[in-house]
């Protein structure tokens, strides 16, 4: 039996961009703390963060056609603090405001208060977690209704945020790109953790009491979404970046790692992480099968 997904690619883009924005801001804070001399790389993270989140919000607004027909629904969304979506709006609003203030201060070459960076960091991580919780509250979909999903989306958000900053940085600030070795080593482990979390999520979902859980997993690993899952997510998004970064960080000579060729190999790895981050969300949104309740009169 086939099912029409209740959400599509636009929602996947929103979830991806919102998480990436939070991860990019967290990366900028990481650079400030661990590599304070890399000002240009720090600016890249501060620039990416608000822009991609705002783009994601615009996509969400265009997709939410019902809200345009009934604007009161958006107003009510701000008053229902028992709703995950309400808290998501709060996190997003605070994050965008803080990220824009930080960006303006940076562009004006003024010192950004540490407390402001901390607020932005917390809100950015909350946004990343919220993107997983938004799906997780849908109890009728075993693939979504898991406590692992917010953790998975958080790890993926930080991974894609760092990848975006490094990918832009390799062209905008190549000298600083070679200096952030600690961040690169931290980033190396994120796709590995992501792989473990995805495997755990699929294992738990497959053994859900409802057949919908098994059908969702089979749709990913051997069904309609299998090619995208194995090729674009697993190979391009996880395996390729892990192999390339392992080569660059631990096997290649330092002269090659810091050469332009080495930088381009790292850039390819970061591009793969971004592809995998988007595919993760698209696959989870699209492959989820709802629980079907059959009434006696339907038999």
For each of these PLM feature ranges, what is it?
Residues 1-34, 282, 287:
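N-terminal signal-anchor module of multipass membrane proteins
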Residues 8, 15-17, 35-37, 43, ...:
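Long, contiguous internal "core" modules enriched in hydrophobic/ aromatic residues
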Residues 18-91, 95-98:
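Membrane helical hairpin/interfacial module
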Residues 50-58, 191-201, 284:
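Selective recognition of specific alpha-helical transmembrane segments in multi-pass small-molecule
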Residues 280-299:
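Juxtamembrane boundary at the C-terminal end of a transmembrane helix
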């Amino acid at each position: 039996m086939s099912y029409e997904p209740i959400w599509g690619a636009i929602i996947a883009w929103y979830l991806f961009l919102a998480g990436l924005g939070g991860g990019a801001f967290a990366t900028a804070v990481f650079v400030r703390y661990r590599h304070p001399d890399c000002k240009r790389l720090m600016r890249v993270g501060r620039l990416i963060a608000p822009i991609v989140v705002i783009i994601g919000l615009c996509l969400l607004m265009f997709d939410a056609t019902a809200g345009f027909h009934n604007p009161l629904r958006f107003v009510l969304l701000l008053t229902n603090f028992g709703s995950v979506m309400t808290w998501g709006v709060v996190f997003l609003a605070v994050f965008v405001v803080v990220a824009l203030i930080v960006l303006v201060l940076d562009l004006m070459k003024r010192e950004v208060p540490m407390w402001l960076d901390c607020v932005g960091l917390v809100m950015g991580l909350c946004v990343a977690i919220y993107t997983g919780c938004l799906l997780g509250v849908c109890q009728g979909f075993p693939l979504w209704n898991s406590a692992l999903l917010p953790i998975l989306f958080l790890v993926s958000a930080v991974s894609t945020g760092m990848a975006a900053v490094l990918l832009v940085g390799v062209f905008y600030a190549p000298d600083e790109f070679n200096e952030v070795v600690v961040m690169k080593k931290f980033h190396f482990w994120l796709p590995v953790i992501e792989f473990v979390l995805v495997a755990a999520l699929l294992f738990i979902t497959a053994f859900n009491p409802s057949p919908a859980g098994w059908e969702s997993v089979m749709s990913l690993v051997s069904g309609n979404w299998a090619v995208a899952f194995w090729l674009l997510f697993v190979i391009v998004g996880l395996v390729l970046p892990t192999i390339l970064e392992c080569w660059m960080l631990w096997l290649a000579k330092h002269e090659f790692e810091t050469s332009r060729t080495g930088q381009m190999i790292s850039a390819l790895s970061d591009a793969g992480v971004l592809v995998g981050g988007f595919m993760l969300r698209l696959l989870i949104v699209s492959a989820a099968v709802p629980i079907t309740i059959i009434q006696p009169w339907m038999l």
